[in-house]
């Protein structure tokens, strides 16, 4: 028996694709122990004719197993069945059973992104220029499922289209603002510890996030300045090419900031942007110092 585990479901399913390319497997989803008992009770189970992958075996996420669950593992351990568990820390006992092979799908990090993208491209028989691979490594989140989904979209483009950087950028979804939005919200709520955590996380996964963050943040601050004194009716009629509900959310998020403070922060962002361009290696301390200067109670 093989147990494949990890938090990145996309990485697990990439590993399963490799397994299935060498031998046919039938894939099922775990429901309960009875389902597994019924499985190994089948006459052909364990023969060369029938091999199974059982996804999301959630009972293996526990720190200890019941008697029935342990018995189930004992029955399955000498078979070719493959179980998947969507956690980094499954039941520790599986690693002590000699007949069980465990495979850990470690989380992606920025250093492994190029390799991950390359593997997906090979699987999809897709050739991308190094420049586009570099851009994808910075634009996509550390999630193999998302990486596969986005690169699969690129496989639908023509040979000439796939070389058009601007076209590729329009096809790929923009995932960065979601992470950056969490950082801006933490700052405006004076949650400095949380903000520092987001800065560290973004810096570890997106090397040029600081400039993107400042662009996003200054845009929000400008909108906040424009709608600060607007009433709900004015927000409905205002023409800023921005969704009305987003304007309401921005007005609410920045309601404690005076116009003078908003202007001061915008000016500070402009100065910080220049500093970052000249001292890129100091992005994290410069950002944290900026956060402490304006967003502590």
Swiss-Prot record:
| GO cellular component terms attached to this protein's record | DNA polymerase III complex
Enzyme Commission number: 2.7.7.7
Instruction: State the top-level EC class.
Output: transferase
GO biological process assignments? DNA-templated DNA replication
Q: Which GO terms describe its molecular function?
A: DNA binding; DNA-directed DNA polymerase activity
Give the catalysed reaction(s), semicolon-separated: DNA(n) + a 2'-deoxyribonucleoside 5'-triphosphate = DNA(n+1) + diphosphate
Q: Can you state the subunit structure given in the record?
A: Component of the DNA clamp loading complex consisting of tau(3):delta(1):delta'(1). The DNA polymerase III holoenzyme complex contains at least 10 different subunits organized into 3 functionally essential subassemblies: the Pol III core, the beta sliding clamp processivity factor and the clamp-loading complex. The Pol III core (subunits alpha, epsilon and theta) contains the polymerase and the 3'-5' exonuclease proofreading activities. The polymerase is tethered to the template via the dimeric beta sliding clamp processivity factor.
Checking PANTHER family in the record gives: DNA POLYMERASE III SUBUNIT DELTA (PTHR34388:SF1)
Q: What does this protein do?
A: Part of the beta sliding clamp loading complex, which hydrolyzes ATP to load the beta clamp onto primed DNA to form the DNA replication pre-initiation complex. DNA polymerase III is a complex, multichain enzyme responsible for most of the replicative synthesis in bacteria. This DNA polymerase also exhibits 3'-5' exonuclease activity. The delta subunit is the wrench that will open the beta subunit dimer.
The identity of this protein, by name, is Probable DNA polymerase III subunit delta
**Gene transcribed to yield this protein:** holA
